[in-house]
Amino acid sequence: MQRRILNSGLASKKNRTAPSESLRPRFIFRFLVLVVSAGTILWPGQGFALPNVHEVAQAVDAHYNRLRSLQANFTEIYQGNGISRTESGILLLKKPGKMRWEYRSPEEKLFVSDGKDAWLYLPNEKQARKSSLKKLEDLRSPIAFLLGKTKLEKELQGLSFAPDVKAWHEGNSILRGVPRAMEDQVQQVLIEVTPESKIARILIDGTDGSLTEYRLSDQKENLEFSETNFRFSPPQGTEVGEGLNGP
């Protein structure tokens, strides 16, 4: 498993048919839930002792706990079931639990939540689906609570460094753990952390053999976002369905 993660951590960018929308949000939702604690830690190359995994986790918690909002460019890479696809766009997060994934490439689509309900909108297909956020089992979901109140060490069992995995950017550290209550869906999660205690990359190794990667860049903190960014009303002529756990 570690060998597959190591080789496919920087997943290829071949277009693919869309995977199930079911697995991706619950994790990133309970996950972009990082918070609480700690102060500044010192990283390799700064001339001091290396931090331990607890210090890194606490610093990540502290960084995101102080934020009211976050904007980032994201790249989502999926490999599994003979499918390979890369998508990208803009991510907006706002306390408490609000998120907007605005996919712009290769096709436009929107995944948005007001903290209570979530919508997936496919404009090219004129389709929209709605689900309660509590019932949603999607790997994007934990990210909604990145600005929340949960400690990283409580979210991930067996948290440790992953020195065998190549970092996206030199100087970053990679953490490895298993998300609690998701052992049936996720074998392990890898989190790449910058020296500034920001999350740069998340890799999710599914029990079905899939690998989903999220890369976050150009992060902008504490911007003012209108509440309308996190609401959705289906345009006229849109076919509306319930539930996001299907393909």
Residue map of PLM features:
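Gly/Pro-enriched, hydrophobic low-complexity segments
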Residues: 154-244
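Flexible, processing/modification-adjacent segments and terminal tails
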Residues: 50-78, 84, 122-187, 234, ...
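N-terminal secretory signal peptides that target proteins for export/translocation
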Residues: 1-26
